[in-house]
Swiss-Prot record:
Ligase as UniProt keyword: yes
PROSITE patterns referenced in this protein's UniProt entry, alphabetically: RTC
Keywords on record: ATP-binding, Cytoplasm, Ligase, Nucleotide-binding
Protein name, entry field: RNA 3'-terminal phosphate cyclase
Residues reported in the UniProt entry to bind ATP: 100, 285-288
C-alpha cells in the first residue's frame, strides 16, 4: 500500500484527487493521511467525498475513513468497470473536479464510461465546465483520449443543480505529447454565460473580454449564452486560444455579487493573455492536470507552462510516488519546461 501525506506541498484536495485516480487505474491501494491538515476546516469535505465515492463506484473499491471531517482515507480498488454511472454531488461542489478525478480511470476501462453528474458547473476554486469542454478535453485528446462533455444545465454556488453528461472512450495506450512552443494563434473563442440574470450581463462580460484582447492585437469570437433554468443566479466567461500546432490555452473568470460584468470579462482576458505572452504550450491550470497523462503515456512527453505552481509541483510528487518516472523541470525564459518518460500504461 502506498502511503501519502496529505499535508505535503499544496496540501489540499488536489493531492487526494490525483492519489485516488492513480490508485484506481493502477489497482494499487493507497492510504492518504493528514488530509487538508493545514486548512481552516481540515479533513474531507462533501465535494472531496463525492470524487472518492465516484472513483470507488468505478472500481468496486473498499473504503476506510470516507466521512466528512476525516483526515485519513484508505482506498482499496478492485477492477475498473464501465457503462453508465449517476453521480450527485448534492451541493454546488464542482462537477469539473469530479471529471478531473475520473477521466484517467475511465480511459483504462474495458468499454466506454458514461457519467451523468449533478452539482456545480461554474464555481469558485475549480475550473469552469466550459474550460473542461474546450481546454481540458482537447488537451487529453492530444494524448489520444476521447472525452465528450455536454452541459444540460448550469449550476452555481450555493444551490448547484447543474447537470453534465460525460462520455470517455477507452484507450489501449496514451500517446506522448511533445509541445514546447505554443505556436501561432489561429483563433480565440469564448463563451460568456448568464443564468437567471439579465441578458446584458453576458453581453457586457463578452464585450469587455473582446476589448481587452483587441488592445493586444487579438480578435476573439465570444458567444453569449443566456439561460433561465438555473436553481440560482450566476455568470462567467471562459476564453480559449487555439494554435497552428494544436495547442490550446484558456482563461476564465466567475461573476459574483458586487463585481461588475466588465471586470469579469477583463479578468478572463488577462488570464488568457498571461498564458499567450509566455509562449507556453499549456496554461498553468492545465499543466497540473497534464502531468498525469504525460506519466501514463508511452514515451517522452514535453510541455511548457507559464509558472511552476505549488499545485503542479505537488502533482508531480504524487505521480512519482505511484509510477517509476522522474519529471525534469527546466526554466526556459518566461516558461518552465516539464519533461517525463512515460510508462506506457496499457489496459
Amino acid at each position: 500500500m502506498i502511503r501519502i501525506d496529505g499535508s505535503y506541498g499544496e496540501g489540499g484536495g488536489q493531492i487526494l484527487r490525483t492519489a485516488i485516480a492513480l490508485s484506481a487505474l493502477l489497482g494499487v491501494p493507497v492510504e492518504v493521511f493528514n488530509i487538508r491538515a493545514k486548512r481552516a476546516n481540515p479533513g474531507l469535505q462533501p465535494q472531496h467525498l463525492t470524487g472518492v465515492n465516484a472513483a470507488a463506484l468505478l472500481t468496486d473499491a473498499e473504503l476506510e475513513g470516507a466521512a466528512k471531517g476525516s483526515t485519513r482515507l484508505v482506498f482499496k480498488p478492485k477492477t475498473i468497470k464501465c457503462g453508465g454511472f449517476q453521480i450527485d454531488i448534492g451541493t454546488a461542489g464542482s462537477i469539473s473536479l469530479v471529471i478531473q478525478t475520473l477521466t484517467p480511470i475511465a480511459l483504462f476501462a474495458p468499454c466506454p464510461v458514461r457519467l451523468s453528474i449533478t452539482g456545480g458547473t461554474d464555481v469558485a476554486w475549480a475550473p469552469p465546465i466550459d474550460y473542461m469542454r474546450f481546454v481540458f478535453a482537447p488537451v487529453v485528446g492530444r494524448f489520444g483520449g476521447r472525452v465528450k462533455i455536454e452541459v444540460l444545465r448550469r449550476g452555481h454556488y450555493p444551490k448547484g443543480g447543474g447537470r453534465v453528461e460525460v462520455e470517455v472512450a477507452p484507450v489501449d495506450v496514451l500517446k506522448p505529447v511533445d509541445a514546447v512552443d505554443f505556436g501561432k494563434v489561429l483563433k480565440i473563442r469564448g463563451i460568456s454565460h448568464a443564468v437567471n440574470l439579465p441578458a446584458h450581463v453576458a453581453e457586457r462580460q463578452a464585450r469587455a473580454a473582446a476589448e481587452a484582447l483587441a488592445k493586444e492585437g487579438y480578435a476573439a469570437d465570444i458567444s453569449t449564452e443566456v439561460r433561465n433554468d438555473g436553481l440560482g443566479p450566476g455568470s462567467g466567461v471562459v476564453l480559449w486560444a487555439e494554435s497552428d500546432v494544436g495547442n490550446v490555452v484558456g482563461g476564465d473568470a466567475l461573476g459574483e455579487r458586487g463585481k461588475p460584468a466588465e471586470a469579469v470579462g477583463r479578468e478572463a482576458a488577462e488570464k488568457l493573455l498571461t498564458a499567450l505572452k509566455s509562449g507556453a504550450s499549456v496554461d498553468s491550470h492545465m499543466a497540473d492536470m497534464a502531468v498525469v497523462y504525460m506519466a501514463l503515456a508511452e514515451g517522452v512527453s514535453r510541455i511548457t507552462t507559464p509558472e511552476l505552481t505549488l499545485h503542479l509541483q505537488t502533482n508531480m510528487y504524487i505521480v512519482e510516488r505511484f509510477l517509476p518516472v522522474k519529471f525534469r523541470v527546466e526554466k526556459l525564459g518566461q516558461r518552465h519546461l516539464i519533461e517525463v518518460n512515460g510508462v506506457g500504461r496499457r489496459r
